[in-house]
Curated annotation (Swiss-Prot):
The lineage of its organism: Bacteria, Bacillati, Bacillota, Clostridia, Halanaerobiales. It holds the Pfam family SMC_ScpA. It comes from the Bacteria. It comes from Halothermothrix orenii (strain H 168 / OCM 544 / DSM 9562). This is Segregation and condensation protein A. Component of a cohesin-like complex composed of ScpA, ScpB and the Smc homodimer, in which ScpA and ScpB bind to the head domain of Smc. The presence of the three proteins is required for the association of the complex with DNA.
Length: 243
């Protein structure tokens, strides 16, 4: 398991997630930007891409992102009942079960093809058909925008016989560079805002979307920008707080 080195914690990423979930460590004290920077440096140094470790990192990082978003946005669940909270917890456990199944699927492809996995993948057989998945309106729509952007990206396609395959490309994108890029866009057009879809347009890689998303959260935490949404499922609007 990949380990992180932070001011408030040193150890496995999964242990950090468990401590945050149990409120042993405040999510506000954790820098997701630094965690991602360390992970990118790690895979750059060791070159040998480990798909199992990468899939585990993405699952846990996604959970930490959701917790971070909830800590930044106003609490909309003040009047929620214990029953509603219980349903939310149960839904989280069901979602985690699906994530684990997907992770097992990636492990199978890692053994069969190293850095190459087949496209498309039918995950229907890994989902319990008796479970009624509903839209959780208590989850930040910012997370939904992130998931939508992640699902719309394509990688570098290669061909092996009649199989259409996708090859995982390693790249290095720094959080600070992306933050500077976003702020520069605001400096060029100080009276205009930006949207999340604009920042991830042009067929970016999944890694770039993750870094962009974390950069937005970090800029929000630093009070450099503010994020708003006009209505449910609409685009995420960003506006500079300079001046």
């Amino acid at each position: 398991m990949y380990e992180v080195q932070l001011d408030k914690f040193q150890g496995p990423l999964e242990l950090l997630y468990q401590l945050v979930k149990k409120n042993k460590i405040e999510i506000s004290e954790i820098s997701l930007a630094r965690i991602t920077e360390q992970y990118l440096e790690y895979i750059e140094h060791y070159r040998d891409f480990n798909l199992e470790m990468a899939s585990e990192f993405m699952v846990i990082a996604s959970e930490l992102i959701e917790l971070k978003v909830k800590s930044l946005l106003p609490d909309s669940e003040e009047d929620s009942t214990e029953e509603e909270k219980g349903k939310t917890i149960v839904q989280r456990l069901k979602d985690y079960h699906v994530f684990k199944k997907v992770t097992e699927l990636f492990r199978e492809y890692e053994k069969a093809a190293g850095q190459i996995y087949s496209k498309p993948v039918n995950l229907d057989k890994y989902v319990d058909n008796e479970v009624n998945y509903e839209i959780d309106i208590d989850i930040s729509e910012l997370v939904e925008a992130f998931k939508k952007a992640m699902s719309s990206t394509d990688g570098v396609e290669v061909f092996e016989g009649d199989r259409n395959l996708k090859k995982i490309e390693s790249e290095e994108i720094k959080i600070q560079d992306k933050m500077d890029q976003i702020l520069e866009l605001f400096n060029q057009n100080p009276d205009q805002g930006l949207t999340f879809s604009q920042l991830v347009s042009g067929n970016p890689s999944k890694m770039e979307i993750v870094v962009t998303f974390l950069s937005i959260l970090e800029l929000t935490k630093l009070r450099k920008i503010e994020i708003k949404q006009e209505k449910l499922f609409s685009d995420i609007n960003l506006r500079s707080k300079a001046g």
